[in-house]
Amino acid sequence: MKGKTGLVLSGGGGRGAYQIGVWQALREKDIQISVVTGTSVGALNGALVAQGDYETAVNIWAEITSKKIMNFEPKGDVFTKKGQLQITKAVAQKAIREKCIDQTPLKKLIETHLLPERIISSGIDFGFTAATYPTIRPVRLFADEIAPEKLVDYLMASSACFPFFKPYSFDGTSYIDGGYTDYIPISLALSKKPNAIIAVDLKAPGFRRPVFRADVPVTWIESKSDLGFLLMFDADYARVNIRRGYLDAKRAFGDHIGGIYSFEKGSFSELHQKFQRVIQSLLQQYFPGKGMGDEAVRKRLIRLALRVLLTKSDKKTMEHNPAVACAEVAASVFHFSPLDVYTEKSFTDKLFAELSLLPSWDIEKIGDLSAFLQNITDERILAKLFYSVLCQDQVSNRRNSKASVLAALAPDAFLAGFFCFLLRPEQKNFQ
């Protein structure tokens, strides 16, 4: 990016590790940050960016625990919905029982790692937000506007996630989390006149100030994955979120392609050329009539397919290469990790290796297809079933009416099977 670049980091509590992954990608691209603003955990991460201490930031998050934030370790498996609900319930109960949780351990963590003088003299404009309590008035400051010894206090104020955490008081004023007045402080960054903004949104609750600066482009980086409960601080989950932030940033900067999964640039470019042609050919094969019946079914299947593609990928990928969006549906159906980077070959090899391990059925011998589908909960099996139908019909040049039923009832599996079918000419040894 040319000119002065601003980095804006939203609030989001335990999800903040994601922003460190974005920082990793920025460093790899040698994007120099001139302005960084943040709210709550975004202010804490922003201070580390201004301090230029990437390794410290990684280490803090890679070793994070709830006890280091609030002297309390709720129990629950962070990688399951049930476990996250247990943690959420435990934190809420503690906040109610104690009339807000004491965040003194967080202050110790900040004091241990942040160097106010270094931040202020870094040459990077570092800004943060907070809100007065109980009046809820915005506090929007840059580090060079306050005394260095007050920076830790203001960062604690910005991070006082009320009503879970207690309001933070100093110099006769009480403060709460900056998200109450400016969750993602783009307007604060714009006050320093950057040429471009990179905004990292953790999708946490908070007030958003409207931004009206069409002349300053904003690159948004946000996750389609679940980054976890706001007050869940776990080292293993944080490391996963760092990876998510890194890969999402790489896609946002155009280094990788994909909406949720990451593929090397140029992947499936040749497949893209025949994607539309094969789709049209299949629709014509299965619904050749020009009457209202076939036309209605065609439109319904297209709507279903588009809905799935936009859910499992994104609009940008759909527009540039729908074959990649289709690959992402297949990746989801076959439970591929979104934390890996795939080449066209590695993805194709992995997909057909998985496909070869699955059982096969002859669709002609299936009586009630709807009842059959209800007994199968594994979408991978359905994907292989549809793939097999497409291959058989191509060889015999026939029209199997059950294929259209399968496509309508299981659109995710249909698209995954269709993607395998697109790749089939390259899989000469696959049976």
Which residue stretches match the model-derived regions?
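Patatin-like phospholipase
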Residues: 1-39, 47-431
